[in-house]
């Protein structure tokens, strides 16, 4: 028996609708990811550069490999994991670089940080290797963690590359609770504490040439 073109079109449309409906229901459902940042807890940036500025070039540095991306690293009983459904708004290494610049710009001391491609007389070269940037659950997975930021700083002469000084800086800031909303502020405080000490040390070590 011959079927009319209208009936055939209706049958095809119905079949297509069923197929599309099935495709929609098969798509995985993903939970929204919360985005956070750190490094904005510093003082306001100074409006003018201090007199007698010492030019310090910020050299390329290392960052803890597993923590350099946009995921938050946790350590529990020696096991490395990432906080679920939580991300930095940008890779941690990018936020760290911005925080370093902000810390030096906000300080009224003699040091002026010079970034790659920026003009200026280089008196010293500063290297900051971030060895640890993580939340440690030392008291168990259900307890509030401690955020650890550990940085190795080295300062060398801009003229002959001789080592002027080096030091390890570390901050351990306990979160007030085992919640992301309390862990993020601990990161902010740890970063601010370490950078404050680094700026003070750099100002004291990088004497005018």
Task: State what each model feature region is.
Residues 2-12:
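Bacterial N-terminal signal peptides that target proteins for export
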Residues 24-43, 107-159:
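Surface-exposed short loop/turn segments
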Residues 24-94, 204-209:
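A structural "domain/chain start" motif
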Residues 79-87, 159-200:
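Short secondary-structure boundary motifs at beta->alpha junctions and helix caps
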Residues 101-109, 135, 199-206:
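Sec-exported extracytoplasmic/periplasmic mature domains
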